[in-house]
Amino acid sequence: MLSVLSINYRYYLMELIDFSSSVWSIVPALLAIILAIATRRVLVSLSAGIIIGSLMLSDWQIGSAFNYLVKNVVSLVYADGEINSNMNIVLFLLLLGVLTALLTVSGSNRAFAEWAQSRIKGRRGAKLLAASLVFVTFIDDYFHSLAVGAIARPVTDRFKVSRAKLAYILDSTAAPMCVMMPVSSWGAYIITLIGGLLATYSITEYTPIGAFVAMSSMNFYAIFSIIMVFFVAYFSFDIASMVRHEKLALKNTEDQLEEETGTKGQVRNLILPILVLIIATVSMMIYTGAEALAADGKVFSVLGTFENTVVGTSLVVGGFCSIIISTLLIILDRQVSVPEYVRSWIVGIKSMSGAIAILFFAWTINKIVGDMQTGKYLSSLVSGNIPMQFLPVILFVLGAAMAFSTGTSWGTFGIMLPIAAAMAANAAPELLLPCLSAVMAGAVCGDHCSPVSDTTILSSTGAKCNHIDHVTTQLPYAATVATATSIGYIVVGFTYSGLAGFAATAVSLIVIIFAVKKR
């Protein structure tokens, strides 16, 4: 029998069914994911998962389910007496939509594409440009996907690179890079978790940041995902449905080209607003982080600022600053009329409505998945007598499954890192860091593939690509790297060597690529 779990919300108290020990906990997420891929109708699929999850948690009482769902939706906007931080992401999306429309109406997108066309040699150069920008924008995955999308999209469009390929490049260089960088929103969060785990198990041979760096070198999925992106960009390694999208783009039959205006734009009108966006966002991240450190009486440090930064607020400030600069440049050029300028705001806001709707639905189902305790159920699967040699690969697969079903890598970190540390510290201390690395890799892999993940949605948004097109074209590449990564972690489990695991992953990936190319 399923027990009853009491959850105390600020605005209401209701009894929810406890699915933490039941396979039924995965039903809402699994239903939404299967329907989304099968029907290609994301909102309908997410709605089905949301409704079924609400009914299951409410013991199939329609009135209770409706009340639960309404309160959850309200909490996305307003919670604990203040506006939810999620609204900053929504506002930033709207600002980015407006900025993109302003860049288009001013002719700067067209000017930048023409400028790049004279300097970038072919489609390969356009794809490599999009991939290389991660070395500038690695501070946050949201920021990377949206900012690089705005910069690279005019260029990839001009060279007839499909939007699906651009979305793949954005997504596969976002979280994989952020998760390995200490000076990023991801790195700061993970280092904080690691510090607590090292203290819990009295491990003194590593500092938290030292352990993080060592773990990053064994995060095979993240490392080889980035390598795969550059390989795909350089050699045009197209597989599965990506082949069709690239052919359509080359024939110019994909609905992807931005509307071009008759305005003779200038390259500076794109470069300056984007530079301001990057500089203002990073500066605000440092400021909000430093302010939080000061409030807690802590000494300023770069790592500390990124650990305590407020990403949403920083993105909004950066967005406003970039729009102000873009507007000033438009005024100076005197080529855009007031009605055209106003229309650009309307067009920009409308362009983000679909992405915002998907985000709200994804956030709602993520709340339901949390109340279903899907993560707790999946984590319970690692209990029992597991051969230590297979522990890293098991944790990788389980972390991927959890992040895929819940749509959150950070939530997976919070649940699985303590479990991995407990198992490894007690049974095989030599495998502690490899096991933690495997969890990080699995979380990024699952988040990377999940159609309900924020980062997947925002990568589609940044590329202005159909969301399910992005999911289905990226999945074969992610599965290829994940397969090679699994082999690498098996080797680590038997050899206790991160270098051996790295080599095994590299060799496996090469073999898989050659096997796929021969088909």
Curated annotation (Swiss-Prot):
Record carries keyword Translocase: no
UniProt xrefs under InterPro entries: Na/H_Antiport_NhaC-like_C
Keyword annotations from UniProtKB, A to Z: Cell membrane, Membrane, Transmembrane, Transmembrane helix
Location(s) in or outside the cell: Cell membrane
Transmembrane segments: 19-39, 42-62, 87-107, 128-148, 179-199, 220-240, 270-290, 311-331, 345-365, 386-406, 413-433, 475-495, 496-516
Protein's membrane topology: Multi-pass membrane protein
One GO term describing the cellular component: plasma membrane
Highest taxon in the source lineage: Bacteria
Chief location of this protein within or outside the cell: membrane
Cited PANTHER family: NA+/H+ ANTIPORTER-RELATED, NA+_H+ ANTIPORTER NHAC-LIKE C-TERMINAL DOMAIN-CONTAINING PROTEIN
Protein name according to UniProt: Uncharacterized protein HI_1586
Lineage: Bacteria, Pseudomonadati, Pseudomonadota, Gammaproteobacteria, Pasteurellales
